[in-house]
Amino acid sequence: MLTQLKTYPKLLKHYEEIKEVHMHDWFSKDKERASRYFVQFESLSLDYSKNRLNDTTLKLLFELADDCSLKEKIEAMFKGEKINTTEKRAVLHTALRSLNDAEILLDNMEVLKSVRSVLKRMRAFSDSVRSGKRLGYTNQVITDIVNIGIGGSDLGALMVCTALKRYGHPRLKMHFVSNVDGTQILDVLEKINPASTLFIVASKTFSTQETLTNALTARKWFVERSGDEKHIAKHFVAVSTNKEAVQQFGIDEHNMFEFWDFVGGRYSLWSAIGLSIMIYLGKKNFNALLKGAYLMDEHFRNAPFESNLPVLMGLIGVWYINFFQSKSHLIAPYDQYLRHFPKFIQQLDMESNGKRISKKGETIPYDTCPVVWGDMGINAQHAFFQLLHQGTHLIPIDFIASLDKKPNAKGHHEILFSNVLAQAQAFMKGKSYEEALGELLFKGLDKDEAKDLAHHRVFFGNRPSNILLLEKISPSNIGALVALYEHKVFVQGVIWDINSFDQWGVELGKELAVPILQELEGHKSNAYFDSSTKHLIELYKNYNQ
């Protein structure tokens, strides 16, 4: 456990020594700070100089990582050891993008051979859709792709297809359905033509309630309009491992793309779950996405901790969570194409590390994953940045931006990028009472009024942030960015001694929903309901009589 590691008390003592130091003072005294706390990898760079740390902090954090045998645990993951201990599974999403020829054997299965076999089928299928060779039941080309999934079967593909829209096929329109409320699927069905639409049903077990409900609604809609169930074979494909259920649905087994238990949902966009990505972007760009992630994998596996991006980001996060007692972390992308990135990272981070039980089954006496949230940075400035600047919470921030200007939008990117740098500087430097007072007096305010108002215009600063810069929003850079955050999450899970690869927290609510659904549908359940739940069930039933 973290609190039992030999470096932990050293970090506690060090925290007491520097907790009141203002970052602005460090910058004033150290002209090399920005260049020393800057790491470049391929087309992605990290400026972590605006953090409340110094060389001693980093030295101790690296010692903490050594206390946890981080290097050995990284290797264990890549080699296919069953580090998902509660489910007795290997964790090999890295194998999905590996360009290495060294085979990984897992329970007598050749992992890379299996992965590449599925990728080959995905490439052939996506080529047939993109080229127009795969036709619908009236011999029309496919114009719309509807991905039906939820969680990891939705968020990754949605995020990547949105981020890389400039690389998408101009004929294809992408639609993503996850919510079971009925509104989302019906809204999509209103926009599309059954004769030119391909549905991708993404569910490992092909029994996920939300996904199957939406898929059956789409199936009913399609059959009513096409007039024959046999046409399903041309318009529905599945990403699943349940061949029998897929065939019962009406999907040809040749249109089923498999993935494996060693790939968790939130790590699965690199697998057949990414079929919608490959169809939209094409195999060349999908390969570039995989390559970007692979290069980050190799960096994570081989780079010394001092220049290792995932290790640095993971350890800096631990520094704030377990020593500064930060409860929250903000993801602020400054690019409209990255608008779904924060909610993708929400699942990746909080479903992985939102745990309080150690690998040994003990209750953990310290904080683990913070609340991860975010929005488009430029919009957020006009919404919740007020709290970040002048509120009472310490919330570290990841600013994410690209250097590449958008064509045909002169001046836009300069405005955007200036705001990234200005916000990071403002969070670091702040504004003192004396500075605020001087500004007000310079504007001609009455002295007494200026003294009162100046208190409200103080920015305390010393608010930490990372700046992640991509040269451009490209397939390889998005691949590297996602892999960076995957490995950051892994690092923190190792430090906290938790299993980052199960998600038992999603199960209880699903179990309790079963008898409640029976009641809502008019069937009696023998389950116990608390008085509040019972009252609300009756309220619903009475309204819908």
UniProtKB/Swiss-Prot annotation:
Its main location: cytoplasm. One of its GO terms (molecular function) is monosaccharide binding. It is an enzyme of class 5 (isomerase). GO terms for cellular component: cytosol. It is found in: Cytoplasm. InterPro entries: G6P_Isomerase, G6P_Isomerase_C, Phosphoglucose_isomerase_CS, SIS_dom_sf, SIS_PGI_1, SIS_PGI_2. Its EC number is 5.3.1.9. GO terms for biological process: gluconeogenesis; glucose 6-phosphate metabolic process; glycolytic process. It comes from the Bacteria. It catalyses: alpha-D-glucose 6-phosphate = beta-D-fructose 6-phosphate. Pathway: Carbohydrate biosynthesis; gluconeogenesis; Carbohydrate degradation; glycolysis; D-glyceraldehyde 3-phosphate and glycerone phosphate from D-glucose: step 2/4. Keywords: Cytoplasm, Gluconeogenesis, Glycolysis, Isomerase. The active site is at E351, H382, K510. Catalyzes the reversible isomerization of glucose-6-phosphate to fructose-6-phosphate. NCBIfam families: PRK00179.1 (NF001211). Belongs to the GPI family. PANTHER family: GLUCOSE-6-PHOSPHATE ISOMERASE. This is Glucose-6-phosphate isomerase. It comes from Helicobacter pylori (strain G27).
